[in-house]
Every structure is written in structure tokens, then in C-alpha cells.
Amino acid sequence: MIKGYSHKPMGTVALGTHLGNFSKEDSLKYVEAIKYAVRNGIYSIDGAINYRGMCSERDEGVALAELINSGVITREEVFISSKAGLLYGDISAKLPPMKYLSEKLENKGISIEDFSEYEGLFQTLNPAFYEIALNKSLENLGLEMIDVYYIHIPEITKSKLTEDEFYEKMEILIGWYEAKCFEGKIRYYGIAFEFMVEEPFENKWHIEIERIKNIARKVSGEKNHFKYILFEYNIMCDWAETVKTQMIDGVKMTMIEACKALELETVASMPFAMGDGFKKYALSDMLDFVSKKMNHVIVGSKNPKHIEEILRYWRGNLSECSGRQRFSGT
């Protein structure tokens, strides 16, 4: 297991590992893409335990080990984020999520009753599940610590509970997160939203981030480790900038405004709208749109040519970015 954690802040641009199939060919592409990205200045890599049946995390682990063992980088020079909360499978063991639950999780006290379901996604706030997932993610990545560990799509569970029930469960889970930060397994944590920002007028998805921040303060004071909010934001989905859904100190704000007020860093997912944006906009237009409002953006790719195109944009066009730091590629 590789010791240490990133001594750099999250990069303005991160490489995402969500897309692709379970094939060895795609895994080889991801390993090479990650190595290419890191060698050329994209030092932040984002994943999740459920991505590609754990293949994505394992591909990250292979790439990181090769880069670090060959002396190209040190652990302190890369920033690794992952996510937990959704039921996952293990493609290498030929275990889809439900079979993984019955064969690997039920004997550890996790049952289907722990999860809430929406459109085939099963989400839980049970800390016991996160404990198992975190240890598995660390194993997959070959690391002793993850720099950011997100709570993945908690809106699914929220939609099935009363307000009080949901925030009570979140307080217990945040207590677990803070404990893992003090143990040295997690550096920071955050929330990766999906439906709340995509469907801002659906009250069932709504979560008050000020209330979550106050829970973190209650659990661990002002030096708590709750730092990042991830959500879809692109030229075709701009609700986070245009709709005032959050209340901060009695003032209605947009998600982006609320995060800034709470000193939470914003992370944009799906900057190209799952590829649909290319039908109407140039890559530079879409990245311009995102970088002016968000601190960080995750760009998913396993294609070095695509990564190079993104690198060219960032090297030449980041002067207007409102993120907390400039792109550090060389």
C-alpha cells in the first residue's frame, strides 16, 4: 500500500473514470490515459467504487503504482478522489451488485433493507457499508489514504425518508467520516449530487447544504473536513447557477452561491453533457462556460488525444477561470 496523501490542492481539471465497459481493452486504455494525463499535468483523478464494477479504481491503482514505482511522480503529487454509497459489484469475480450483496456483504451485516432504490441505483447511508467500501477502495487503489471521499447521491435515500430521519442519518454518517479523517484513511470528504441539481424543482431530492455544513461543525467544529460539493454543471444544465434553491442565513441562493458562502469548493461533473454538448458547441465553449463559475471540473476520458485537446485548452485559456488555482501542467 502506498503511504501518504496529496500535498497539492485538487486540480482545476481532474480526469474522470466513469465511462467505458468492463473489458480488458478499456482497462488498458484507462491505465494509459491516466499515465498520460499525470505525465502532462493533470494530477487529479476521480473515480468511485461502483464505476465499471470496480475496474476503474483498479485501473487507477495499476497506473498509480507504475507512475510512483518508476519515479515519475510521488504520492504527494497526485490527488485522488472516490465515492461510496451506491451498491457495487465486482466484475473480476463475475459478481453483479445484487450477487455481490448476497455473497460478500450480507455476512458482514449489510442487507437490501439498508438501501433505497431509484431507477436501478441502490443507495445507503449506513456507515457499516461505507467502512467496507472504503477499505475495498483503498485496496483497489493501493493507497493508505484517499484525498477526497464523497457521499454518492444521498438524494436517493433522502427521497424515501422524512426530513428529520434523513438528517439524523447524515449526522451519524458524517461522524463516521470525521473519524476516518482522524484515522488517516480520508483527507477530506464531500457530497456528489445527481438528481438535486438536475431536477431542482423536485422537493423530494432537496438537501440543504447549510444544514449539512452545520452538522459537520457540530460533529467536529470549524476544523471539520467537509470541503467539496460535486454536481452536474454544463452549458446545457445550468440550474446550479440560475435557480435559487438553497437558503443560507435566511437568504435564498443558487447552489454555486451557497457553496461559496459556506466555503465549500465546487466540482463540475459532465461538462460536455454526456457528449450531447458537442452537437451544438465547441469544446472550448463548454469548458469556458464551466471554468468561469466552478472551482474544479471532472473530464472523463480514456483517450490520450482527447486529453491532449483538453490540455491545449487549459494551457492557453485558463486566465479567466474563477477556480482557486491555475492549471499546473507543464
What are these regions (language model features)?
Residues 3-8, 38-39, 64-75, 139-143, ...:
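Acidic (Asp/Glu)-rich catalytic clusters
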Residues 74-78, 144-148, 188, 224-228:
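Short acidic capping loops at alpha-helix termini that bridge into adjacent secondary structure
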Residues 58-82, 169-184:
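Alpha-helix-loop-beta-strand connector modules within alpha/beta enzyme cores
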Residues 3-23, 82-119, 150-158, 273:
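N-terminal small/glycine-rich loop or linker at the start of catalytic domains
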Residues 9, 14-17, 24, 28-30, ...:
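Beta/alpha (TIM)-barrel catalytic core signal, keyed to glycine-rich beta->alpha loops juxtaposed to Asp/Glu
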Residues 122-145:
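An active-site-proximal structural segment forming one wall of the substrate-binding cleft
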